[in-house]
Amino acid sequence: MFENSAKESSMSSSRSSGSPDVSALVTPNNIEEVKEPELLKIIPPQGPPPSSSGSISLEDFKPSFNYDLEVFNLCKEYLNTRNHHGLALITRQKGIPPFLRFKVWPILLKSHPFVINPFIQPDQDLMKESSSSSTSSSTSTTGSPINSEHSSIKDGILNQGNDTREEPQPQPSDPHEEIRQKIKRDLGKYIQRLKYSQSKYTVSELEHQILSILEDSVLKFILKWGKIIKYDSSLTWVALNLAEWFPPIPKTPWVLVGRDYSTADSSLVINLMDDYSNYIDNIPDLKSYLENLIYNDEKISNMSFREVFERLVLVLLHCPEPESRRKKSEVSKHASDLDHSHVQSMKVNKTTLPKTGGTIEERVSYFIYCLRKLLPELSQYFHEEQILTKFGCLDDEWLIWWLKFCGTKVWSKYDRGRIWDFMLGWRLKNPRRDFNYYYEKLNYVNRNTLEKLGPDIFWSVGSEDNNNVERFKNNQGLTRDKKTSSFKDLINDLHNDLHISKKVSTSPGVRNTSHSSILDSSPNFSIPFSRVDPHIALIFISLSLLKSKENTLVELDQHEIRQYLSRLPTKSYKYKSKNKMNATQKRMSSSSNSSSNSTSPLGSPSNLNSNTDDPILLPTNRIIISNDSNFDSKHKVNFIDNIILESGELWRKWLWSEMIDDN
């Protein structure tokens, strides 16, 4: 079974990852195939593993999580029909329920623009840019993010003191075996973290099997893409962090626990459903539905861990095409616009980077620029503590992990999972498609549900939105000529939502009295699409995270700041209060009431809220199911969702300040 799936996965991965840019450098079919390790022949557990669902423990560690029931039902509908348009919309707007990521992420990755047309900045280009750009760096090897990146690509970012001492050891003659040994060494660091840095540790047979799959997945990626990028420890960390949400062994629920979870026996694995058992138990039939997805499903998604890992890396490490190639395509398509392109380089960079994205060097510079503009006090404190001056492995490499590797290793798995949701759901609107096309793809989603998903996080004012523009002007007490603003084109390009007004018909299936009354009552509604490049959006998410930790950071010294940001704590995780028996009893009663009053994902609104006088008072679209253990505990609910929303506010604040400065 594993051999067949390996053959199928290698064929599909070679089909999906080929592109004109990359195939010229690497032809996946010419890469030597790696034999599956013997551990893969071990038969995975067939029955459901022991779960904490339904059991009550005074040491009940649960991540805070709540989710609108109507959006959940819509997500389930899209998942059952493999509707990647609908899943991408929900994923970028609200995030995916964490216990469904192992089925949703493969569907999103298969259709992701960065997977369909991949481009990863080759190491040679990085070295050329490294030698030519010496902006604000010292002459030491760790003086700039670029130099540190090259050393990390060669030696591994985590190669600190103990790693360099290991280098003099004799290396295997086989280059494949040499890479495998590096992967094993980086996997060992993860194990040491979770085994409390014990000098000697043992792993179970199940843990060994999972780690072997991760090792094999990283090795095969390097053999396929090794002519573009060399092995780097970040690849192993991406595999480890993916395994915290996607079970490496097919048809099992076992995932890595991550750093936020601790078990009495220091186990590396946990049941996928355990963390969210409170939420799962509050929705009838959801547990059986999830178990069917885990143990029986082969229709929705049967992508292997190796295939998902490869596609995830292509998304996280994606880089836009070099400027020279972009200019060649622009010459053929926009020759008239090139005459107007002789603008100041700084302004061109600021007005194009949010839409096109940039290299890691450009993103680091842009991050520092936005930090000074949006968080001046924190930026000044960082300057005093000499933060963001050196980017070597002992300095500010945390920023490289934040921006280039999208929070791999340094963020909590709960925060990182939600941010990866946002990035995997990123989709641009095809200008050749109209509203009716996408509305049909969304299966004519209810207008109220669409409004509940909200606008794109990084919405901005469109040039045709005169009312909003006038409101901005009045609030600032100024007027400006939009035609003279160098940000005019940027705003127009970013204003890409598909709107439908009461003057426009949707489709034959929507042209009825009920829908027409909806259109008459409200002038318009829209389908939100992504506006800002996801890696640029990640910069504002990172700034939002720093803003939320600002009060803590200003109390720390240089070393403490770097340690703190290299292992950023989460607020999405809350420990249950100790030994309160009445709290346990309250949870039992509230859980039973919620279970009887909630709707099944397949249920109807008429079954809602049987203990209330008027069921209309609590319709389906207002029910929020929570993962909290008891109602009187003060959980930090939706911390990362608030961070993402705040990042949109920071984006608009930056855009507005640039518009003012530009005048």
Swiss-Prot record:
InterPro entries for this protein: Rab-GAP-TBC_dom, Rab-GAP_TBC_sf
The entry's keywords: Cytoplasm
Gene3D superfamilies: Ypt/Rab-GAP domain of gyp1p, domain 3
Subcellular location: Cytoplasm
Region: Disordered, residue numbers: 1-28, 126-178, 575-611
PROSITE patterns noted in UniProt: TBC_RABGAP (PS50086)
Comp. bias intervals (Basic and acidic residues): 163-178
Domain Rab-GAP TBC residues, every copy: 95-427
Biased composition (Low complexity): 7-23, 130-144, 589-611
GO cellular component: cytoplasm
Family: Belongs to the OCA5 family.
Designated name of the protein: Oxidant-induced cell-cycle arrest protein 5
Species of the source: Candida tropicalis (strain ATCC MYA-3404 / T1)
